[in-house]
From Swiss-Prot:
Any one Gene Ontology BP term: rRNA processing
Keyword field contains Chloroplast: no
Record-level GO cellular component terms: cytoplasm
Cofactor binding comment, as recorded: Binds 1 zinc ion.
Family: Belongs to the endoribonuclease YbeY family.
EC number: 3.1.-.-
Entry protein name: Endoribonuclease YbeY
Pfam families: YbeY
Record InterPro entries: MetalPrtase_cat_dom_sf_prd, YbeY, YbeY_CS
Top-level EC class as recorded in UniProt: hydrolase
Job of this protein: Single strand-specific metallo-endoribonuclease involved in late-stage 70S ribosome quality control and in maturation of the 3' terminus of the 16S rRNA.
Cofactor: Zn(2+)
Length: 155
């Protein structure tokens, strides 16, 4: 089972979009060969809240589109596939204000941008990063492949 706990602090995200994000992340989970049960949360916030989270937890006083807090920073200490317990991946926090701005700037739907940001955060929870060119190429390539195969394209 894959459990995603959604919370919308903004009132801007339609509950039907929770289902699409759930389907997208479930699809990504399979593509990333995570076979055991897993849990994560996705929270939608405004600019003030994400800036405060960045300031308090990341020592960066700025607004970002998405933040991920992974509970497993490195390799898990145990192989969760050997046990019948869920793997708690962490938290994804998405700024709806920035998502809306980016969707308009890129010329695609708000719903598509939310899916993109949720997947981006999910891949961070799995250990992907974009701190250097090679890592960025790998992460963004994986991200694009999953979005395209799922059918959530920029068009």
């Amino acid at each position: 089972m894959f459990t995603i706990d959604f919370s919308d602090h903004t009132g801007l995200v339609e509950t039907s979009w929770f289902d699409q994000i759930d389907q997208l992340l479930t699809f990504a989970k399979k593509k990333e060969n995570i076979h055991n049960d897993a849990e994560l949360s996705v929270t939608f916030v405004d600019k003030d809240e994400i800036q405060n989270i960045n300031k308090v937890y990341r020592d960066k006083d700025k607004v970002t589109d998405v933040i991920s807090f992974a509970l497993e920073e490195d390799e898990p200490e145990i192989d969760f596939n050997d046990f019948d317990i869920p793997r708690v991946l962490g938290d994804i926090i998405i700024c709806t204000d920035v998502a809306k701005e980016q969707s308009e700037s890129y010329g695609h739907s708000f719903e598509r941008e939310l899916g993109f940001l949720a997947l981006h955060g999910f891949l961070h929870l799995l250990g992907y990063d974009h701190m250097n060119d090679n890592d960025e190429k790998e992460m963004f390539g994986r991200q694009d492949a999953i979005l395209n195969e799922f059918g959530l394209t920029r068009n």
